[in-house]
Amino acid sequence: MVRLGVNIDHIATLRQARGVDYPDPVEAAMMAIEAGADGITLHLREDRRHIQDDDVRNLKRKLTVPMNLEMATAEDIIQFAEEIKPEHCCLVPEKREELTTEGGLDVAGQQNTLKKVCARLAKVGIEVSLFIDPEEKQIDAAKAAGAPVIEIHTGHYANAKTDHEHNQQLKRIADAAAYADSLGLTVNAGHGLTIHNVQSIAAIPVINELNIGHSIISRGVLIGLAEAVKEMKTLIAGAQ
């Protein structure tokens, strides 16, 4: 069964929009877990635009499922992760001006740096994944960097405008997933996945986990967060 990691960043986005103390990401995480989330994902950005340090601390104390902390390779955030010790860390690229993560890490271009970060996090018991585009050279570089897990960026698939482009991007992801699996890597995926496009990705045989946030939180505004999580879980299960 493909696992569902629910990203709660945009609960914090809603809170930060008013500079108040609600809605509480911890409360949202507990609701998501009750509804069937297999893990909770959150991105501690360098600019702290949504998730704050205390959110991570509070969640780590209360979570009953694994935490997946998305993070850049900034030294202060690496040190914070070493202190908090989430079960998983996903290293992602980051630009201050972006609305959301726009693509995968160039692991091949910064392999030495990433190898050191992977080793540091692994030393304190954190399983590290690298968020990458579905390209063999990036998968090879991730393997060489010592990451046991990759997360395939599904954004180009999600943003495809035509059936041809959709099918082309889906094949890229499926081929990349199979290649990574052949190297012994665990394969996760995420970015831009919704109730309308998740099943084709969930049906890829070697996918271990999907990390989904914005679309679940958005659906939650309309139908309730618990129902939105259950809906996504049902769709993922139906794709197996």
UniProtKB/Swiss-Prot annotation:
Q: What is its main location?
A: cytoplasm
Q: Key word Cytoplasm present in the record?
A: yes
Task: Report the subcellular localization.
Answer: Cytoplasm
Q: Which GO terms describe its cellular component?
A: cytosol
Q: Which GO terms describe its biological process?
A: pyridoxine biosynthetic process
Q: What is the enzyme's class at the highest EC level?
A: transferase
Q: Could you say which residues form the signal peptide? A: none
Its pathway, per UniProt, is: Cofactor biosynthesis; pyridoxine 5'-phosphate biosynthesis; pyridoxine 5'-phosphate from D-erythrose 4-phosphate: step 5/5
Q: Which GO terms describe its molecular function?
A: pyridoxine 5'-phosphate synthase activity
Residues that hold 3-amino-2-oxopropyl phosphate according to the record: 7, 18, 192, 213-214
Keywords, alphabetical = Cytoplasm, Pyridoxine biosynthesis, Transferase
Which positions does UniProt annotate for 1-deoxy-D-xylulose 5-phosphate binding? Answer: 9-10, 45, 50, 100
What EC numbers are recorded for this enzyme?
2.6.99.2
Q: Which InterPro entries match?
A: Aldolase_TIM, PyrdxlP_synth_PdxJ, Pyridoxine-5'_phos_synth
The residues annotated as site (Transition state stabilizer) are: 151
Could you name the active-site residues? 43 (proton acceptor), 70 (proton acceptor), 191 (proton donor)
Task: Check the record and name the HAMAP family matching this protein.
Answer: PdxJ
This protein's assembly is summarised as: Homooctamer; tetramer of dimers.
State what this protein does. Catalyzes the complicated ring closure reaction between the two acyclic compounds 1-deoxy-D-xylulose-5-phosphate (DXP) and 3-amino-2-oxopropyl phosphate (1-amino-acetone-3-phosphate or AAP) to form pyridoxine 5'-phosphate (PNP) and inorganic phosphate.
Family (UniProt): Belongs to the PNP synthase family.
Q: What is this protein called?
A: Pyridoxine 5'-phosphate synthase
Q: Which organism is it from?
A: Coxiella burnetii (strain RSA 493 / Nine Mile phase I)
